[in-house]
Amino acid sequence: MDNEKVTDTNPKEPSNVESIITTSEVTPSPPPSTTTSTTTNATTTITTSQPQANIIGGKRSRKDDEIISIQEALNDQLEEEKNLLEEAKEQEQEDWGDESICTFDKGYINQSVFACKTCQLSNDKLFGFCYGCSMHCHLYHDVYELFNKRNFRCDCGTKIQEPNNSFKCQLSGILKEDDNNNVNNINNSNNTTTTTTTTTTTTTTTNNNHLNDIDIGSYDKSQILNERNHYNHNFKGKYCYCDSPYDYKEDMIQCIFCEDWFHENCLKLNSNVTDIPSPGEFSDLICADCLSKNQFLLLYPQIRCYIENDHIIIGDNNNNNNNSNNSNSICKVEGGVITPNKKYDLFCKELWKDELCSCLKCKEIYKDKKVEFLFEKDENSLKKKNKTVDENLDNKPVNVFEMGQDVFSKTLPPTQQRALIEGFSDMKEKLKELFSKKLDKNQVITKQDIQSFFVDLNVNKKFKK
């Protein structure tokens, strides 16, 4: 507390004046943008019973030179602990996957993805890996948590890490019995060739999605490239239009198309609205770049949710182009004209995907744009819904503060409870005296002052005995 500053805000009533301190001495420093434990400071997607935008962050922040009272500092600390507890509860509900296996053999799936800053020092190629590899192969590395990525296959130990020949995936080839069927996912039908080190691989056609059945151990993972994986600046630990590292104090919203994360303030600057809807008022965000690449969405004005004169406006469901008939032969937007519009971010209303046309012609557009995922069910949401309330109650993180209160009231005799409360009250009064003295003299409270304070407090405690 060397930098603690005392300011006389009310010289006529020094006894009622609380000491003023700078935030830098009290507010806990934010975690770094990289983590060595993939679940410690991870933040999660908000999930409720209603469709809702993916949002992370949301911590209160103060300016570095802001002057606050001790009460405000304590309130900030309590708020910080509350936020961390809520975050831990949300983390517990996340389906991170099995940390004992690598998901490479499951193919291109929706999963939590991580990137490694440490490995990037020796390899300028972008790559990502699954939760299992983050807990084994990269456990002691600086790891970026990228949250959920769609249709992504684990890169750990593949050819993309070729410059680092000494690195091997520790979980390669480790499968559970019920995962054996997933080996078929090694090569998707969209891949035309596969490089293997053996000549004994048997190729068979099993279904429309996968062409190759590969037995465990019959391929060399280090010679395979995941050509269908998509990489962006998230894999460098950067997010948003501003290309900044993750800051846990700022709210970020995920675009459903590119799966990048955007700061609320940056969205306000980039969008054509002065404010953005709150999380419960819109379902998904489509960033301006993705909207410009998928302009067919402009044919559906009824999916929009935006703010006008401080009121949430939902697009009209009964527009002329909309047809409630979902027949594959009838196009909802036939004859519609896309009018060039100002570049902006699109906030979509609840159940907006149901408004999209499902005729054969439109389905070809979706396939060409590679946005067929819009019609797929969210596997993660289904898993969370299937998780019972009892499981959540049994496994939820413990509120340490509440647990301490419970232990205090149940285990300590009334006499000891009174002694502790009196001791705390005595310390509080003596702190006020110290602050008032420093305030009268307009002096800064130093580390030595605090050390002397506790020495005197212990001496007085002995005399009382």
From Swiss-Prot:
Record field: compositional bias (Low complexity): 34-47
Q: Where is the composition biased (Basic and acidic residues)?
A: 1-11
ZnF bounds (PHD-type): 237-293
Query: Which chain segments does UniProt annotate as zinc-finger regions (UBR-type)?
Result: 100-174
Q: Where along the sequence do coiled-coil regions lie?
A: 65-98
Q: Give the compositionally biased regions (Polar residues).
A: 12-21
Q: What is this protein called?
A: Putative E3 ubiquitin-protein ligase ubr7
Name the species this protein comes from: Dictyostelium discoideum
Q: What is the lineage of its organism?
A: Eukaryota, Amoebozoa, Evosea, Eumycetozoa, Dictyostelia
- Which gene is transcribed and translated to give this protein? ubr7
